[in-house]
């Protein structure tokens, strides 16, 4: 499985974030989770799972609507959150080498990740790293709606994974969805550094220099890479 990806990369890092809001240059990451996959004896194998609450900036807090959505409270962050600088170091370790970064709605997560690294780490660790957005893939495979929970249901995974709006659950759900996508049509490598966006809304967040953006309708008639 994922033969085309592992022909190009030594490591896949599938990740997800939970944040205090939607504005990547103002709001903050409060949880970062990732699964690191490498080939071991020719078999894709999870070699590391990472899930960490992230400390807030001085005076920061988790808004009530985010507490309700995620179950993460300001008190949780105060008691269990790691400093941003430490989380940034952990991420740098995960993505070193010939690594592909993957996420569901990667534009959102990468925008937040870049700004956290800019403030508290080294954004250069993302330079030269290829990216794959599984939301773009799913839009090509199924009609609207396109939330992660929609993909979970479409691929019959509801009894195996959950879209709980906790990063650790969502990243495991993303891995399961990705596996089903690969079984369905093994063309994930065609979406590397190719992100779709809804024409009505444009590209959300800061455009990523290494990514090609193409308008993608809600009900795609052909793969975006054609």
Regions found by a protein language model. Name each.
Residues 1-118, 122-128, 149-165:
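Conserved non-catalytic scaffold segment of RNase H-like nuclease domains
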Residues 1-4, 175-226:
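Acidic two-metal-ion nuclease catalytic site recognized across multiple nuclease folds
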Residues 130-146:
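Short alpha-helix plus adjacent loop in nuclease-associated cores
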Residues 146, 172-175:
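A structural signal for well-ordered alpha-helical segments within the folded catalytic domains
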Residues 113, 137, 174-178:
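Buried hydrophobic packing segments
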